[in-house]
Amino acid sequence: MEVTRIRALRGPNLWSHHTAIQSVVICTAEEDAVSSIPGFEAKLRARFPEVSPFQPVGHLESVSLARVLELVALGLQAQAGCPVTFSCTTPTVDKHVYQVVVEYSEEEVGHLAMEWAEKLCNSALHDTPFDLQAALEALRELDEDVRLGPSTGSIVDAAVARGIPYSRMTEGSMVRLGWGSKQRRIQAAEMDVTSAIAEAIAQDKELTKKLLSAAGVPVPGGRSVVDADDAWAAAQEIGLPVVVKPNDGNQGKGVTVNITSREQLIRAFEVAKEFRDDVLVERFMPGNDFRLLVVGDKLVAAARRDPPKVVGDGVHTIAELVAQVNADPRRGSGHSTSLTKIRFDEIAKTTLANQGFNADSVPAKGQRVNLRNNANLSTGGSATDVTDDVHPEVAARAIAAAHMVGLDICGVDVVCDTILRPLEEQGGGIVEVNAAPGLRMHLSPSFGKGRAVGEAIIGSMFKKGQSGRIPIVAVTGT
């Protein structure tokens, strides 16, 4: 068997509406009917038991090795967790030559699946070893590397549900929605009309606070500092406890909250300095951490974020309890899973030390131990959906903050006791405004129901009835 002329069909095609890998497969006369190859099917199934039946029940036609290649390529992707269902094999006008078409969800994964399928078929033909788990692991790892993240993926899924065509413009998260003059573009949760100036403002936390304060939105007081001594001076001006963080950081990196001593502040300053030279000290706002998602002029989702923590059982150390929590299949090392693994870094060690613990401590049964004081999902926190609980005045403040910065998709971080009451009544405030906010806490919260945030974003980009398509009468070529 020779597999040639492999190419990707990146849209609706002669065979189906699915994206697919198409190849021309040349078989020998014997390979035109695998039933004539002694022991082939048994050897193949011994190596890959999950492969589909070569023919539906009741069909007696001979099956070519090209057809087996098709089924193996599809089955390997399915076993690796890729959502694929379509494949077909069609003979050509040339004897022993077939067109094999196999759906893919990610182009690179489709190509690799075809390569592994050819190796598996040859292994069964020549009775040589084949490592199925290595093949599946390679496909899974590649799929995780190249597939769209949850934020971009949710927007693309919403577009597909609306009949809006899409194509990836880069190997990253930049995607084209629609065709020609009707097209729009996204990169993660950021649209093509997002202002570069608005994004720059959102990255500058101190400037953002000045704008929000001028608009009457409650924010914590604070200022930029140049060194540890200046940071302590700022803390004295503001009043302890304080928060120290990079002025243009993200995902909670380098953030230390609830600092009550000079020693803690110096350590926090050093941690923040590792991420950015410009460091901000601001008043610590006690309360819960909420993320409100604004799209256009609407609040579309809200979640309470809780810091990463473990609960003692009186037997295991904190390090062992963290390992147990990280074993949850929902937790991963990136943003492709609904939760992120808790990691032991300097901030985690400092947080433990402030509670009188270290990694080898054994907390009492039922005792809660925080690994961080900030609640970002990217550092191992969890999320609870609270969209239905948001007070109208809190929603109005979040929308006003997004508009003041100029963002059309905006993640507004609020700290307060409860979002059931206005911020001013409880001394709460808006602590950050984020461009390109992560959506996974709203799509798959740890607790509560997921929200259709991808649909909300697509709805803001394409009016009802619009599909981003241009009518095509015919396609010709030579």
Residue ranges and their predicted role:
Residues M1-V160, K298-A301, D306-D313, T317-E320, ...:
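ATP-dependent carboxylate activation and anion-phosphoryl transfer catalytic cores
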